[in-house]
């Protein structure tokens, strides 16, 4: 009897240790939900982004999505409730049905494990939804409806996102990348998460002061790379500013130039517990931004397409990269504008197989893919490519050439075909895909390093392509993310706006203090 009782007691103790932490332990370890929704979507493109374009991670999959969770120290600092992360490569505007579906599924999962001490909200910040302004502001309000205002929300963003007053108010902590290209994307998210855990562990809770300053500047990302001045120095000033006593974090958003809402402009924020330090930090960064506004220029020399091609054909340097920037799918272009490829194939230099070698990456063309797969490698194929989504500048293009490669299984493209037309290797995809790595080319049997000219639908070159180029020009081609912002027909952004309104007066760059969430007077 005595032994039985002891075993029973032991089982009871083990169960208590294993299944539910003591109330003491529960207090020490905050309960945090992980939530994410991200896309950058252009309203100047006829493309739409539907739910099937979003990659999603649910439940425990989310721990492997974030590389920093391999650090068990961070894992052990909280009880985590991963919900749903949805991300799409940039594209066109999101229909309300897709938005409601993604938000609804995420909120349903969020409702399951309440209450929360914290929510980590991972967004891009430049989502556009048909008929809905400021989707991220809407999303965070709906998260608040679920979790209430006792919960701290830490929002992590892309520096090309937009920060409305509503988003700033509902976020207790908020930050964004400090590098473009975004080599610090994971590090920034980790900072947002660690700041949240710190505030919960220390029981300091919501920061007392959040300063928000709208800066009336709207610039394309291709003019604001932090690899070159003036963005390099501007963004380098952020980290030291956050070392001050009473300042938790600060951030500068360039904002998103290819959507037309009042929230599309640059923003500076700082927050912490010392009102003066917070206000001054935000004001200094905002003034710095405004003072260097005239120094922003394109990351590479630019030209019309013909100017770029003339120079590349003339050049002895190879590979000579040309960015087909107006239809860059990673900024929100449809990715199927045929204008550039049409112009390239018209050039006499590329008509013969002995012309300068050129790789064109890439154009979606499901009709050609189907014919090429049927005909096989080495066969002649003729079919239309592109112009299904965005035919405003040129119609679908009939190309006729030899199939050089057929590769199946890419997660974005699904099927990729290389068709040789004259001296041009055209990469045709079933679905649109950005070409950002050397392997993207070599997988298809192409050698970009030994090619005279490589044209990519991209803006600034991502690091791997940048390191490969012998020379580089950015062609100002038409499309949904036209780099020449003055060609865009803005109706709803705030005016005056630099550089659209050249002679505007200096704006008011004093700090506006956003109410602590839930304390709106
Ligand atoms: Zn970005």
Identify the function of each model-found stretch.
Residues 33, 38-40, 44, 96-100, ...:
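Active-site histidine-anchored catalytic micro-motif
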Residues 113-118, 316-318, 451:
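Short acidic/histidine-rich motifs immediately flanking catalytic phosphotransfer sites
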């Amino acid at each position: 009897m005595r032994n039985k009782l002891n075993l029973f007691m032991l089982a009871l103790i083990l169960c208590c240790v294993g299944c539910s932490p003591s109330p003491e332990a529960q207090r020490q370890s905050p309960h945090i939900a992980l939530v994410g929704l991200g896309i950058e979507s252009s309203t100047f493109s006829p493309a739409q982004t539907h739910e099937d374009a979003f990659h999603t991670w649910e439940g425990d999959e989310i721990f492997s999505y974030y590389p920093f969770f391999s650090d068990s120290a961070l894992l052990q600092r909280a009880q985590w409730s991963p919900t749903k992360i949805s991300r799409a490569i940039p594209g066109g505007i999101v229909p309300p049905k897709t938005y409601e579906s993604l938000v609804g599924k995420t909120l349903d999962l969020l409702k399951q494990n309440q209450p929360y001490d914290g929510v980590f909200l991972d967004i891009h910040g430049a989502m556009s939804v048909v008929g809905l302004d400021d989707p991220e502001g809407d999303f965070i309000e709906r998260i608040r409806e679920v979790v209430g205002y006792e919960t701290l929300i830490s929002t992590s963003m892309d520096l090309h996102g937009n920060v409305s007053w509503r988003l700033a108010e509902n976020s207790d902590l908020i930050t964004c990348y400090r590098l473009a290209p975004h080599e610090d994307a994971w590090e920034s998210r980790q900072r947002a998460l660690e700041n949240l855990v710190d505030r919960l562990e220390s029981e300091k809770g919501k920061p007392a002061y959040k300063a928000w300053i709208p800066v009336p500047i709207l610039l394309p990302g291709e003019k604001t790379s932090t690899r070159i001045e003036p963005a390099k120095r501007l963004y380098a000033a952020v980290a030291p500013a956050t070392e001050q006593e009473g300042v938790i974090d600060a951030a500068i958003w360039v904002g998103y130039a290819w959507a037309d809402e009042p929230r599309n402009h640059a923003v500076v924020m700082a927050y912490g517990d010392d009102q003066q330090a917070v206000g001054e930090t935000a004001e200094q960064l905002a003034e710095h931004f405004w003072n260097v506004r005239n120094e922003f220029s394109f990351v590479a020399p630019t030209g019309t397409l013909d100017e770029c091609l003339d120079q590349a054909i003339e050049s002895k340097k190879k590979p000579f990269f040309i960015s087909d920037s107006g239809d860059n799918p990673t900024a929100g272009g449809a990715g199927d504008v045929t204008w550039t490829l049409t112009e390239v194939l018209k050039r006499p230099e590329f008509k013969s197989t002995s012309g300068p070698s050129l790789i064109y990456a890439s154009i979606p063309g499901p009709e050609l893919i189907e014919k090429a797969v049927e005909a096989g490698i080495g066969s002649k194929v003729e079919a239309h490519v592109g112009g299904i989504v965005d035919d405003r500048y040129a119609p679908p293009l009939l190309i006729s050439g030899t199939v050089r490669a057929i590769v199946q299984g890419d997660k974005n493209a699904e099927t990729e075909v290389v068709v040789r037309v004259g001296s041009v290797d055209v990469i045709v995809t079933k679905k649109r895909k950005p070409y950002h790595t050397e392997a993207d080319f070599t997988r298809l049997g192409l050698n970009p390093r030994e090619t005279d000219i490589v044209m990519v639908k991209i803006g600034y070159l991502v690091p791997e392509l940048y390191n490969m180029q012998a020379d580089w020009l950015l062609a100002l081609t038409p499309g949904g993310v036209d780099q020449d912002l003055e060609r865009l027909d803005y109706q709803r952004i705030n005016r005056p706006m630099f550089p659209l309104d050249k002679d505007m007066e200096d704006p008011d760059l004093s700090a506006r203090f956003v109410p602590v969430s839930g304390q709106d007077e």
